[in-house]
């Protein structure tokens, strides 16, 4: 129905131009607040009434008269009604909705997507966890969000690049090394000589054991072999970082998340990018010295105060490598960049953007985009689960996957807006009933597959069958919802809102179950049976496509 909607919008734009030159850009359809009022709603008449100095209903009547004469409306529209102060409600003919079934079956896995344009490059940075411990459930939410946002924008034709940025040096990494060294020397948390601060989880003992055994670990396309020398802090640091990066990769693999590149913060220093970025800002006249420190004039770009770039002791503040890193993203050709980060990073947004603006590199003011998320609470039997033995102080992503499933974790973590606190209910994730959203959606897909298997015919004929038997209210509602998939993807991508996809899939599953309860599929009448089979096959395809965007499987059997 996508082509039909375009034809109708084109006719609406022409009619609006006839009413008021320049008004064609107001051509748009909305979903009626009450489904019984129609399939599309249009508010353009109310927008035009004031400049035309007319009563909105009078403008709506004039617009309706023009639409009734448009060939596209004559062919595909059953009724045009005016309601309230000037709403125009449009009801489509059954044949218009039936076209959706053909479009879905013809496009298959590509339904709702745009061809990839390699000139539109987008980079999404997410997870970006420092290698100091296992990934926690907050990282899991970030992994699910980042991967789904990448998938969403890929459906819109963008060439998407997934990147993981982490720090392999600094205070946290030093703490990791001293903790591992202490374990390798036989110490444990609570002992007199146990270092403070330290990481106390059992995973530190695992690293120390493998270090002493001189094992080899591979991460980020590099191999590290442990020396076994408990006095060699640099060897311990390198091995511990590689070990935990490998462990994080195993977690991400279990979650079906793959990255195109891993970017080391230390490379920004070794390559001279940090120094060159600072020099660039100096040359642009955007810095000044005060109290022995170097400051950025970030208030010139909307920040609430100027920021220290280089402290009096000669070290850089943490946002300087961030500016250098994002400048590198732009120079690598990524004209669109998105960062998925925890809510605690909110304070860095203005200063990073200010630094990029001050660099005079032609970077847009809103670069990069940010999606900030809250943390996740985990409950079981109504009580919060706070501690993992392996991590020592938090529930890990691997725990959650092992307790439930990767599909459940993905769908659950994507079912709410990122900035909304999420409570992950383990009991609900394990439930095999309609209260479990991922089970409900996957079951709809599996139910359709079982019907198609029971039928056992050639599905390739669905694209040519007579769809006129699909006239019941339930069939019409299902086809209209299938037709909304493309626009839903577009809006979800624009708003970085994979939760919209999860909501749509639940709505589609509910609509399918209602249809299934209302009409038997495998009836004796061959024409009716084939039409209904075509509809449910199209529904299965859209369920499959939407689940794929979320990174969730679509099982054929359950």
Curated annotation (Swiss-Prot):
One of its GO terms (molecular function) is arginine-tRNA ligase activity. GO terms for cellular component: cytoplasm. Keywords: Aminoacyl-tRNA synthetase, ATP-binding, Cytoplasm, Ligase, Nucleotide-binding, Protein biosynthesis. GO terms for biological process: arginyl-tRNA aminoacylation. It catalyses: tRNA(Arg) + L-arginine + ATP = L-arginyl-tRNA(Arg) + AMP + diphosphate. Pfam families: Arg_tRNA_synt_N, DALR_1, tRNA-synt_1d. It is an enzyme of class 6 (ligase). It is found in: Cytoplasm. A motif ('HIGH' region) lies at residues 129-139. Its EC number is 6.1.1.19. It comes from the Bacteria. CDD domains: Anticodon_Ia_Arg, ArgRS_core. Coiled coil: none annotated. The keyword Aminoacyl-tRNA synthetase applies. Monomer. Belongs to the class-I aminoacyl-tRNA synthetase family. This is Arginine--tRNA ligase. The lineage of its organism: Bacteria, Pseudomonadati, Pseudomonadota, Betaproteobacteria, Burkholderiales.
């Amino acid at each position: 129905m996508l082509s039909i909607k375009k034809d109708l919008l084109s006719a609406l734009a022409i009619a609006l131009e006839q009413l008021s030159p320049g008004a064609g850009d107001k051509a748009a359809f909305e979903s009626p607040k009450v489904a019984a009022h129609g399939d599309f709603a249009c508010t353009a008449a109310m927008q035009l009434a004031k400049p035309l100095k007319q009563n909105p209903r009078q403008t709506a009547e004039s617009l309706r008269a023009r639409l009734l004469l448009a060939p596209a409306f004559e062919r595909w529209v059953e009724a045009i009604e005016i309601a309230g102060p000037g709403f125009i409600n449009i009801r489509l003919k059954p044949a218009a909705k039936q076209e959706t079934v053909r479009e879905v079956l013809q496009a298959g896995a590509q339904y709702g997507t745009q061809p990839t344009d390699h000139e539109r490059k987008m980079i999404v940075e997410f997870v970006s966890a420092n290698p100091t411990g296992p990934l926690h459930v907050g990282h899991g939410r970030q992994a699910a969000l980042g991967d789904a946002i990448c998938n969403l924008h890929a459906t819109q034709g963008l060439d998407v690049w997934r990147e993981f940025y982490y720090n392999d040096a600094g205070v946290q990494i030093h703490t990791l090394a001293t903790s591992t060294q202490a374990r390798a020397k036989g110490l444990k948390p609570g002992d007199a000589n146990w270092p403070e601060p330290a990481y106390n989880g059992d995973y530190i003992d695992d690293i120390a054991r493998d270090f002493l055994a001189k094992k080899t670990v591979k991460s980020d396309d590099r191999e590290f072999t442990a020396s076994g020398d408990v006095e060699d802090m640099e060897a311990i640091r390198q091995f511990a970082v590689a070990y935990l990066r490998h462990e994080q990769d195993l977690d991400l693999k279990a979650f079906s998340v793959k990255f195109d590149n891993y970017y080391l913060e230390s490379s920004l220093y070794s390559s001279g990018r940090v120094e060159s970025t600072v020099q660039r800002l100096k040359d642009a006249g955007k810095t000044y010295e005060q109290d022995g420190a170097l400051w950025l004039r970030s208030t010139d770009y909307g920040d609430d105060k100027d920021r220290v770039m280089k402290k009096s002791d000669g070290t850089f503040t943490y946002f300087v490598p961030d500016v250098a890193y994002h400048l590198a993203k732009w120079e690598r050709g990524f004209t669109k960049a998105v960062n998925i980060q925890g809510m605690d990073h909110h304070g860095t947004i203005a200063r990073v953007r200010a630094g990029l603006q001050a660099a005079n590199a032609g970077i847009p003011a809103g670069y990069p985009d940010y999606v900030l998320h809250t943390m996740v609470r985990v409950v079981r039997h109504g009580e919060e689960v706070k501690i993992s033995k392996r991590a020592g102080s938090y529930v890990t992503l691997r725990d959650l996957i092992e307790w439930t499933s990767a599909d459940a974790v993905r769908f659950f973590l994507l079912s709410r807006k990122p900035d909304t606190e999420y409570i992950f209910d383990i009991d609900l994730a394990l439930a095999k009933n309609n209260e479990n959203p991922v089970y409900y959606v996957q079951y709809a897909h599996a139910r359709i597959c079982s019907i198609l298997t029971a039928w056992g015919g050639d599905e390739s004929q669905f694209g040519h069958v007579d769809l006129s038997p699909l006239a019941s209210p339930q069939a019409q509602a299902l086809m209209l919802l299938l037709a909304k998939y493309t626009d839903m993807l577009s809006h979800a991508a624009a708003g970085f809102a994979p939760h919209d996809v999860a909501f749509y899939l639940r709505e589609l599953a509910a609509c399918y179950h209602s249809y299934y309860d209302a009409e038997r599929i495998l009836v004796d009448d061959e024409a009716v049976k084939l039409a209904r089979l075509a509809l449910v096959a199209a529904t299965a395809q859209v369920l499959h496509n939407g689940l794929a965007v979320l990174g969730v499987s679509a099982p054929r059997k359950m």
